[in-house]
């Protein structure tokens, strides 16, 4: 049995001890080193060559975000951030994801839940065929795109692992005159969807916000579905609206929000006037929704294997015939605009 070599970076000796004690119970993990700050980590990591690194965000000497940026240069390796649920912590976490971190785990709250989530994300990080690339920028050439020629009414984008940097590659490229609303379903921990929306808003010409219950979905606006809730597309009085529901019970194998639920509702409400986009991510969420949109005459786009951090969700949609076009990440914004 192959073991995942893990390196732990955290300024708290107690957290390092708890992580080592908890993860040592899992035979697939071999802890190959630890550091109490980023400076120490940058010296040790290239020597022990771990498969994955857990990196605390808030540390003295060299913080987690600065360490991540330096690590990208000296020893590129899948990194999982350990973050707090504070406003500052959430904002810094989103920035870390956009700078190459594969995923994150909030270390506040129930420790058993923290360890369980971390174990799962270590497996995903090791399986990830590549690390997310930092945002490269760029915009569409308006001369190459005629917006609105296909009469679409809605774009729904789904993503999981590797999603935040992928979204940052797509949304800022879209023009301010984009004629329909865009809904983003990103698998993310509750409390982190608004910072994701805020970060996208800072680099985009479109208005980007976290969606609110029953609000009208307006053209030229990007709505990030709030984490921890069921999100569906609805129609009230001829206008598209956000249907946001607090789950009565959280099912362990279900996502809140779910790409499938959002896309299936879009297939019902806007049908052939829908564009569905499925980006990098683990699992199969979104495959059924993409197929439903395509079967109703809508247009569906999946990110290709080469540019996906994890090629689970796009592949699942392709395998069941739910995809109109498979494209590299860099080409998706233009494809959306050309088919709107």
Curated annotation (Swiss-Prot):
Phosphorylated by CheA. Phosphorylation of the N-terminal regulatory domain activates the methylesterase activity. The active site is at 160, 187, 285. It comes from the Bacteria. It is found in: Cytoplasm. The keyword S-adenosyl-L-methionine does not apply. Residues 148-340 form the CheB-type methylesterase domain. One of its GO terms (biological process) is chemotaxis. It is an enzyme of class 3 (hydrolase). Residues 5-122 form the Response regulatory domain. It catalyses: [protein]-L-glutamate 5-O-methyl ester + H2O = L-glutamyl-[protein] + methanol + H(+); L-glutaminyl-[protein] + H2O = L-glutamyl-[protein] + NH4(+). One of its GO terms (cellular component) is cytoplasm. SUPFAM superfamilies: CheY-like, Methylesterase CheB, C-terminal domain. CDD domains: CheB_Rec, REC_CheB-like. The modification 4-aspartylphosphate is found at residue 56. The keyword Phosphoprotein applies. Contains a C-terminal catalytic domain, and an N-terminal region which modulates catalytic activity. NCBIfam families: PRK00742.1. This is Protein-glutamate methylesterase/protein-glutamine glutaminase 1. It comes from Carboxydothermus hydrogenoformans (strain ATCC BAA-161 / DSM 6008 / Z-2901).
